[in-house]
């Protein structure tokens, strides 16, 4: 097998891995939505009242 063929196979594997990772990540967003909402609620509850958390203006502002 030549270097060109090995490089093409490598690119194919990287592309396939990226596509599978991207589609599985989008599919899991719906299932993790309640957990994400709980985390943001905890940030608002415990962090927004403290001056140390000024680095999250889009959540607390």
UniProtKB/Swiss-Prot annotation:
Pfam families: Toxin_8. Residues 22-44 form a propeptide. The keyword Lipid metabolism does not apply. Expressed by the venom duct. The modification Pyrrolidone carboxylic acid is found at residue 45. Residues 1-21 form the signal peptide. Disulfide bonds join 47-53, 48-60. Keywords: Acetylcholine receptor inhibiting toxin, Amidation, Disulfide bond, Ion channel impairing toxin, Neurotoxin, Postsynaptic neurotoxin, Pyrrolidone carboxylic acid, Secreted, Signal, Toxin. GO terms for molecular function: acetylcholine receptor inhibitor activity; ion channel regulator activity; toxin activity. InterPro entries: Conotoxin_a-typ. GO terms for cellular component: extracellular region; host cell postsynaptic membrane. The modification Cysteine amide is found at residue 60. The keyword Disulfide bond applies. It is found in: Secreted. The cysteine framework is I (CC-C-C). Alpha4/6 pattern. Alpha-conotoxins act on postsynaptic membranes, they bind to the nicotinic acetylcholine receptors (nAChR) and thus inhibit them. Belongs to the conotoxin A superfamily. This is Alpha-conotoxin-like Lp1.6a. It comes from Conus leopardus (Leopard cone). The lineage of its organism: Eukaryota, Metazoa, Spiralia, Lophotrochozoa, Mollusca.
